């Protein structure tokens, strides 16, 4: 009787051990399946199975290949994992004709479409935000292209040409405004940071100062952001209404003199610089 109970108990323990091992194995597999990563799927208009698509980075206006995918059954797929969000390009070229779209490489499912009239990357937060801005810009570009083509009509009167030029200028302002609004809406994410670094010079000092204060801590030491901070601080220091910056120079006879030696001594101080 005792032997039977011992044997039964031993078999039960073995079953529990097997179940525990199986549970651990399933847990490991589950963790591996849940590991953060990206899957990029897309199509290219006019491409054939066997053609090559690349993920590339752009450095000093030059493309550098980072990954390769072969088109199969009309689609291409990239898989990998990112520990940070970066701007990259998906490119395709054949017989001298190429098409590309820049996007934000980040973990998640990203869908890409490359065609003559539609270049898009969507599916993740940063790419959706970027595509929203791109759609607005593309619409403006199309209107500008139509005006540019219409300007070639030799039958247009001077008044009609002036009207077209005015419309074109208004679209340029709309383009800048679309970028500005995109930056303001996304300044706390990689999309807004990238566009801000590209367009800050079009902003007022006040606008740049306000945007810089909203940039997340992990971007505060970015090389370009640091430069923009420096430029903005210098602009603030020399803005109208600010106290003058004192400096010292030598007179023609070699005597050192400061601006403060003259400011406040009369009604007006004129400082003339020449090279």
Question: PLM ranges: what are they?
Answer:
Residues 1-43:
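Bacterial Sec-dependent N-terminal signal peptides
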Residues 27, 245, 269:
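Conserved Rossmann-like nucleotide-binding pocket used by diverse enzymes
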Residues 31-177:
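A non-transmembrane, solvent-exposed segment enriched in polar/low-complexity residues
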Residues 63-64, 243, 267:
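Short, small/polar residue-rich loop motifs at catalytic or cofactor-binding pockets
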Residues 85, 98, 119, 161, ...:
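N-terminal targeting signals for export/organelle localization
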Residues 195, 247, 271:
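Conserved hydrophobic/aromatic pocket- or pore-lining residues that grip, position, or stack substrates
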Residues 226-264:
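N-terminal "domain-start" segment that seeds a small globular fold
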